[in-house]
């Protein structure tokens, strides 16, 4: 993850020192988009680092040849999140909305994503967190560990952060570029087809997979294909190791169309050369994730 941050710092250094950034016209707009994307992606990575590890080194410039700035002490997580929010406010001003510029799809970090990520960080900044040591002026949770206390900011600070998050989420809603697809079935069909949704842009940011790599979607996570069959690709099966539970299934209203798309109570298997569905039966902790369904995937992904 720090490798990505190093690349981002190098990119920002190059952009900020380029005359194209102030040249005017289309070249300046392109450089501004590059800068906005870089700020957003760097913030995304740092946000994950903070959520995973808490206080981590905050590195905002490329490494020097003598490595004099390569080995840094940890920075307080709140300082990091505050820095990211400032960067994202800048990114919001630099980035276009999805499809506002030709070819600028949700596979790029867009203005909508910068708004959404900033709101997410603001809400996280306002929340409870286990700290390495207590901070003055923060609220401490009841029954917290005395060595590593669980704390959150004071009420006034939380209110400001909530208002900040609301303003950025409202900007997304008001603009109207990103909307919920009225058909959840169509939304997941498009995802299985690896087809970008150009009508609703419900997924604010879709990170493309690497060339020749399709991750474990549809294999570890998805409808189970039990036994070898070439009908759905060369490998011919999927493990469906990630499971859902019966309490989750029954948390849906029986008329909720999302239930049977989310929860697959069947598995696929070859019988005399014919692929058939079979019910799982009594499997309260073994319901498959139906959203990724090999039957809906395009040939390139199978």
Predicted ranges, named:
Residues 1-53, 68-104, 290-302:
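Conserved, well-structured interaction surfaces
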Residues 59, 96-116, 129-227:
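Short, surface-exposed recognition loops and adjoining beta-strand edges that mediate ligand/DNA contacts
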Residues 56, 64-66, 211-212, 266:
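Solvent-exposed loop/turn segments at secondary-structure junctions
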Residues 39, 115-121:
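TPR/Sel1-like alpha-solenoid repeat signature
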Residues 1, 168, 178-302:
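Elongated scaffold/linker segments in the mid-to-C-terminal portions of large proteins
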């Amino acid at each position: 993850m720090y490798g990505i941050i190093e690349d981002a710092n190098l990119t920002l250094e190059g952009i900020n020192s380029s005359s194209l950034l102030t040249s005017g016209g289309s070249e300046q707009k392109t450089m501004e988009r590059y800068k906005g994307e870089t700020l957003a992606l760097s913030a995304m990575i740092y946000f994950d680092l903070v959520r995973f590890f808490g206080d981590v080194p905050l590195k905002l410039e490329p490494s020097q040849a003598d490595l004099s700035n390569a080995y840094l002490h940890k920075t307080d997580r709140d300082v990091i999140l505050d820095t990211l929010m400032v960067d994202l406010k800048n990114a919001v001003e630099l980035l276009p909305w999805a499809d506002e510029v030709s070819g600028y799809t949700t596979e790029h970090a867009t203005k909508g994503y910068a708004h959404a990520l900033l709101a997410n960080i603001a809400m996280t900044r306002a929340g409870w967190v286990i700290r390495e040591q207590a901070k003055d002026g923060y609220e401490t949770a009841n029954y917290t560990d005395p060595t590593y206390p669980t704390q959150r900011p004071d009420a006034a600070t939380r209110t400001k952060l909530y208002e900040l998050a609301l303003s950025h989420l409202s900007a997304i809603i008001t603009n109207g570029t990103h909307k919920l697809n009225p058909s959840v079935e169509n939304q997941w069909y498009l995802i299985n087809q690896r087809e970008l949704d150009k009508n609703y842009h419900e997924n604010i940011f879709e990170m493309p997979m690497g060339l020749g790599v399709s991750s474990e979607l549809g294999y570890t996570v998805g409808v189970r294909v039990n036994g070898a069959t070439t009908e759905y690709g060369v490998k011919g099966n999927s493990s469906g190791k990630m499971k859902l539970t019966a309490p989750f299934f029954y948390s849906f209203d029986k008329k909720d169309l999302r239930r049977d798309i989310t929860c697959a109570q069947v598995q696929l298997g070859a019988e005399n050369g014919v692929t058939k569905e079979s019910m799982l039966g009594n499997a309260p902790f073994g319901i498959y994730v139906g959203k990724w369904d090999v039957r809906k995937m395009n040939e390139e992904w199978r």
